[in-house]
Every structure is written in structure tokens, then in C-alpha cells.
């Protein structure tokens, strides 16, 4: 796949006990990296493939995003950076242009190879060195530039409509400086990422609670943190919502109110206790399942390390570290981080909605005014309604198993209880924890 600033080639499900297949895959990787022929006829065939890919991706939201980029990234390379780009270019670029591009950017100092599987590491390393020995580093290579994203004092707002979009949505971004790659392999980075994760988790819990109301102000809402849209040289805290056709104004005001409530008053001890416990439980689960981790999990971790310098100390280290770190980070520290993430400047807004007669959307001026009003919203601190009452006042009388049938489905044992509930039990060694689900028709 190709995205804004990376291309990843992947070969999966290779039978490692078949030497000839493994060797063929290494040759394929070699040719992708430096030896693609780029014959005129093959280039023309690929133009057709890319045209079809463009057509399949040319959705209403894709068109809105393409039009939004110049507003979100004014005077920037990111303003026009969709991977496929212009069909006019795809149809008409000279053959030599793609050959020059390939020679310029497909080179060993910008490439990494990740191989994960049931292999002999020393043998695989020797094969790699032999297969890739003829791939030479270029003389005076072009500089790999990471383009910065400018700050903005006034909100950058884009409003787009399209006939293919069915429901309105709005996204607010609060930009911040990206964490330096050179400092990511530190305890400090883990602590900051943990605190951001906790803040996002608790805000999402509040939004989910609102969604459960009888007549919620939005059909969906969420908060998040990561790269600013398509640029990894800037980070952003974001909050977004979707709504009914006539409800985007209420939706956007509600999510901004909850964002401001989190900034102004922070989160409660009880909210944090739950979020931290769930986080540590997930870490423990990953630790317990470490011997059964899938290859893709390792590969994705290695890709993040190679491209973004994300640390990869291993789950054993992370499990021990986070069980020491998390209990010693108070909720006050989380609240302070939220105040830093939700800024009065560096705000970007993307509103997308159906192009329909009679449907009205807030103007850029109205959205900007609402953002400026955030600090004056009439809000009260969030009240975490935690009950100390037992789940059941009285322990119910137990039923009984009325029938038991072995080998019913996939080697399970089927139990039928006296209240009609059907229970399927299967003992496996796939997971180190108990898995339970309770669906109903």
C-alpha cells in the first residue's frame, strides 16, 4: 500500500518449510526494492489499474478531503498530496518520469526489510545479504524532507458537501508539536503517551454515556490523538461527531462543551481508577498471550519503529514498566495534559455533509465564534455517578442443568439450563484468559 509518505510491500502466509518459496519471496523483495523493469507496455497497463483504483476510491468523502487539504495545510506540500493524485498526470506522464522517480527514491538508505516467522535467523540474514548485495547506495542521494506544518492563530475551517454523503459530520483538531523522534525511546515518552491515552479514554467514556441518552445530540462521537490528519510532522488532539441530517449544530456544540468540561474541570478519581484498571488489564492480557502473538503484530511494530522511531522493547518490558508507571501517575497529571492539548490556537475544523436542498449548515463565522466561546460556556464539573450498592440485592436461587450434549458444535459441550439459556463450553489452549460472550437474538 502507498500512503502520504510511505510505501509498504508485504508478502504474507509464506510456508517457511518450503525453501524454494522463501527464496522466491526474497527475490521478489529484491526486485521491488531496486530492479523493477518499468517497460513502456507495463507502465501503460498499470495506468489502467490506477484509473480503476481512482474510480473505486472517488467517494464523496474522498472528494471533500481532497478539497479540504488546501485549507487545512495552506501554502504546504500537504495541500495537494493524495497518493493517486491527478488522473491527468496518471494518463499522461512520460515514461522516463517514473523511471527517474524510482531511481531517486527506491534506494537502500530509505528502505527496511522485516521478516517474521518460524525461521533460522542466522540463515535468513545470510540469504538477505547475498540477495541484496548488488543493491548499491546512490552517490549524492536526494534529501528525504519532512515538511513542517505551520501554526495558525485563527481557526482554519472547511465546509464541504457532496451528494454521495448521507449524514453530516464535523471534526475539530487542536494541533500541537509532534514528539521528537530522537526522544521517543525514553520513559518520558511512555508516560506522556499513557497520560494522553487515559485522557482520550475518559472523554470517550463521557461521549458514549451521552450517546446512551433517550434522544442524544449526536449519532456518534469520539475523541482521539495522533498525527494531524495526513501529516506526521504535527500532532493533534481531535474530537468529532456525526448527527442526524438537521442536527450538526447541536452535535458540534455538545462535543465542544464536553471538550471544554474536560479542559476546565478535568476528570474524577473514580473515572481514572476505571480507565487505568482497564488499561492495565489490556497490558496484562497482551503479556499473558505473548507466546501466541501473530506475525502481523510484530511486523506492524517493526514498521512503526523503522518509519517513526516508535520504541519496541517487547511486551515483557512494557508490562513491567507500565505496572510501575501507571499506579504512580495521578489524575491531576492527566488533567494537566488535557489543558495542554486543548488549545486556543492551532484549531482546524472539517465539516462534511449531504448536498441536499433545504439542509443548512453553520457558517465558518458561526463555527469560529463557537470556538471562541468555549472558555465562557456555562458548565458544571462532570458528576461520576458511582453506586456502592450491590449489583443484586439478593442472591438469586440457582437453577440447574437440564441437559448436556458433548461435541455439539466444533467440539463444544452444550448445556441447557432450567431457565432456557444455552451454554457452549470449549476448553482450548489458544488464550491464557477466559473468553465469554452472551449474545441474544
What are these regions (language model features)?
Residues 436-441:
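Conserved small/polar residues in nucleotide/adenosyl-binding loops
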Residues 172, 177, 189-268:
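Structured mid-domain segments that build the active-site/substrate or prosthetic-cofactor binding neighborhood
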Residues 6, 37-55, 120, 139-153, ...:
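Acidic/histidine-enriched alpha-helical segments
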Residues 75, 112-168, 277, 281-286, ...:
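An aromatic/glycine/proline-enriched structural segment found at the starts
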Residues 114-117, 273-417, 423-424:
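C-terminal regions of mature proteins
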Residues 1-62, 92, 96-110, 120-123, ...:
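Active-site-adjacent, His/Asp/Glu-enriched structural segments that form or flank metal-binding
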Residues 4-6, 108-110, 167-169, 234-236, ...:
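Extracytoplasmic
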Residues 4, 21, 25-28, 32, ...:
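Scaffold signal of the M16-like zinc-metallopeptidase fold and its non-catalytic homologs
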Amino acid at each position: 500500500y502507498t500512503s502520504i509518505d510511505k510505501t509498504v510491500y508485504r508478502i504474507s502466509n509464506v510456508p517457511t518449510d518450503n525453501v524454494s518459496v522463501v527464496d522466491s519471496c526474497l527475490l521478489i523483495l529484491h526486485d521491488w526494492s531496486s530492479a523493477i523493469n518499468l517497460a513502456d507496455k507495463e507502465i501503460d497497463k498499470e495506468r489502467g489499474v490506477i484509473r480503476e483504483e481512482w474510480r473505486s476510491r472517488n467517494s464523496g468523502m474522498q472528494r471533500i478531503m481532497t478539497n479540504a487539504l488546501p485549507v487545512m495545510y495552506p501554502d504546504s506540500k500537504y495541500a495537494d498530496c493524495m497518493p493517486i493524485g491527478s488522473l491527468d498526470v496518471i494518463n499522461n506522464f512520460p515514461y522516463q518520469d517514473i523511471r527517474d522517480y524510482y531511481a531517486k527514491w527506491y534506494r537502500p538508505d530509505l528502505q527496511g526489510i522485516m521478516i517474521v516467522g518460524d525461521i533460522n535467523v542466522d540463515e535468513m540474514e545470510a540469504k538477505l545479504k547475498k540477495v541484496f548485495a548488488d543493491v548499491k547506495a546512490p552517490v549524492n542521494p536526494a534529501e528525504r524532507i519532512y515538511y513542517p506544518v505551520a501554526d495558525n492563530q485563527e481557526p482554519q475551517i472547511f465546509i464541504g458537501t457532496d451528494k454521495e454523503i448521507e449524514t453530516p459530520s464535523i471534526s475539530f483538531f487542536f494541533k500541537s508539536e509532534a514528539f521528537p523522534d530522537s526522544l521517543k525511546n525514553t520513559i518520558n515518552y511512555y508516560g506522556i503517551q499513557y497520560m494522553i491515552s487515559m485522557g482520550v479514554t475518559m472523554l470517550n467514556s463521557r461521549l458514549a454515556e451521552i450517546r446512551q441518552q433517550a434522544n442524544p445530540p449526536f449519532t456518534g462521537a469520539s475523541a482521539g490523538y495522533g498525527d494531524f490528519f495526513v501529516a506526521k510532522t504535527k500532532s493533534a488532539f481531535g474530537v468529532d461527531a456525526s448527527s442526524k441530517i438537521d442536527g450538526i449544530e447541536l452535535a458540534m456544540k455538545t462535543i465542544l462543551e464536553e471538550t471544554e468540561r474536560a479542559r476546565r474541570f478535568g476528570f474524577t478519581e473514580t473515572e481514572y481508577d476505571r480507565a487505568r484498571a482497564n488499561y492495565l488489564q489490556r497490558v496484562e492480557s497482551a503479556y499473558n498471550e505473548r507466546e501466541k502473538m501473530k506475525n502481523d503484530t510484530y511486523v506492524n511494530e517493526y514498521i512503526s519503529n523503522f518509519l517513526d522511531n516508535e520504541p519496541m522493547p517487547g511486551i515483557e518490558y512494557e508490562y513491567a514498566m507500565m505496572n510501575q508507571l501507571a499506579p504512580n501517575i495521578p489524575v491531576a497529571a492527566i488533567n494537566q495534559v488535557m489543558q495542554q492539548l486543548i488549545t486556543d490556537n492551532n484549531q482546524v475544523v472539517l465539516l462534511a455533509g449531504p448536498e441536499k436542498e433545504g439542509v443548512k449548515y453553520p457558517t465558518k463565522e458561526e463555527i469560529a465564534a463557537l470556538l471562541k466561546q468555549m472558555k465562557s460556556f456555562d458548565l458544571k464539573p462532570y458528576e461520576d455517578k458511582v453506586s456502592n450498592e450491590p449489583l443484586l440485592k439478593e442472591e438469586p436461587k440457582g437453577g440447574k442443568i437440564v441437559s448436556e450434549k458433548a461435541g455439539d458444535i466444533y467440539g463444544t459441550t452444550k448445556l441447557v439450563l432450567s431457565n432456557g439459556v444455552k451454554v457452549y463450553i470449549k476448553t482450548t489452549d489458544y488464550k491464557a484468559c477466559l473468553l465469554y460472550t452472551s449474545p441474544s437474538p
